[in-house]
Amino acid sequence: IVDVVANHLRGDHNNIDNDLKPSEYWHTFGGGIDWKNRWQVTHGSIGMPDIATENPYVQQKVCNYVQELKSVGVDGLRWDAAKHIGVPSEGDDFWKSVTQYGLYNYGEILGGPDDRSTGNEDIMKEYTDYISVTDSNYGKELRDSFNSGKAPTSSGNWSEKGISNDKLLYWGESHDTWSNNKDWGFSNEMSQNVIDRAYAVAASRN
């Protein structure tokens, strides 16, 4: 599985291919995202230049990359920051375009498509028309439960909201929960025993 970052780029704009420099290939909303607003989640900057994934030329560039990966033996893709790339009902055919090559695809969706506690289930289901998705909230529940010595109280966050189990991925921790500061570094002060037990339960679900 190859980790593909197609939502944004990092670094000097001068190093971007010349054909991708025109402004129509980029979102210009900027930062200050209202995380309960899906348009802002999919068009706002998360600290890096945000690619206009709804643009057909951008999609073709990514499709060419996917085909190149497949040609060298790659059979699966992890899509970084998938929640920041829209779905067809939002006017973005990116997922329909890039998943047509017979590879396994899953997207990193931290929390949910946005920060609304309800009302975003249809968007999550629409993602799963094309890719599998992560259920990071359930991973957090597993970690917290083992860390506190209590049993988990649910059988899965998104599965209980109607998302098919065969479209969900679980983990004990991720690079985000381990390496970030206290706002996101949920697991970096937990013992390895806690993480191992969380992974054991998560693996039994996958």
What are these language model-derived features?
Residues 16, 47, 159-160:
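Serine-dependent carboxylesterase/thioesterase catalytic core
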Residues 7-9, 84-85:
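Short acidic, Gly/Ser-rich segments with clustered Asp/Glu that frequently serve as metal-coordination loops
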Residues 48-60:
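Active-site mouth loops of central-metabolism enzymes
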Residues 8-38:
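Aromatic- and acidic-residue-enriched segments that line the glycan-binding/catalytic groove
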Residues 13-15, 55-56, 92:
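Serine-centered coil/turn micro-motif
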Residues 2, 63-206:
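Active-site-proximal helices and loops of the catalytic beta/alpha 8
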Residues 33-50:
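N-terminal small/glycine-rich loop or linker at the start of catalytic domains
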Residues 1-4, 8, 60-61:
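Aromatic- and glycine-enriched glycan-recognition loops and surfaces
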